[in-house]
Regions:
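Stable alpha-helical elements in mature extracytoplasmic
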Residues: 6, 23-26, 43-47, 62-66, ...
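Periplasmic-binding protein-like
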Residues: 63, 67, 71-109, 127-130
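Short helices/loops that flank or line small-molecule/ion binding pockets
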Residues: 8-11, 29, 44-60, 64-65, ...
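Flexible hinge/capping segments at coil-to-helix
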Residues: 1-14
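Short, well-ordered beta-strand segments
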Residues: 14-17, 59, 93
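Ligand-binding clefts/hinges and TM-proximal coupling segments of bilobed small-molecule sensing domains
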Residues: 22-39, 77-84, 106-130
Length: 130
């Protein structure tokens, strides 16, 4: 188990994140995490290695990656996700009315209709956007 209950518990601890990432921004923007001993890493997987090795107390990284790499059946079965700091949403932009936009919309509609998109979301522990 962990004694972690909020970011206040990490104010004097070593926290790692990927340099230039949203995790790094979250650390600098959080009142408590900004007081932590922050160590930047070149890739998010290095952050997990630091926590697993005990050289860092916590890592701030993308939730999708964390869900895929942490927990039972992974190389980091002894680690767990204990908090979500913020949500990021991404989109893809096309010129309005373009053939590319129409093709992608049609593909998404088909993947939703036949259940493929939901199956992929379930497989990777993701939530579909509305």
């Amino acid at each position: 188990g962990t004694d972690y209950t909020s970011t206040a518990d990490l104010a004097d601890k070593t926290v790692v994140a990927e340099a230039g990432s949203a995790g790094e921004a979250a650390i600098s923007e959080d009142e408590n995490l900004s007081k932590a001993d922050y160590v930047s890493k070149s890739v998010q997987t290095d952050c997990l290695m630091e926590v697993a090795a005990g050289t860092a107390d916590a890592a701030v990284l993308d939730l999708t990656l964390a869900n895929a790499m942490i927990g039972e059946g992974t190389d980091y079965a002894n680690l767990k996700i204990v908090d979500e700091l913020n949500a990021e949403e991404y989109g893809v932009a096309f010129r309005k009315g373009s053939d590319a936009a129409a093709a992608v919309d049609a593909a998404f509609d088909e993947l939703k209709a036949d259940g493929t998109m939901q199956a992929l979301a379930d497989k990777y522990d993701l939530a579909l956007a509305d």
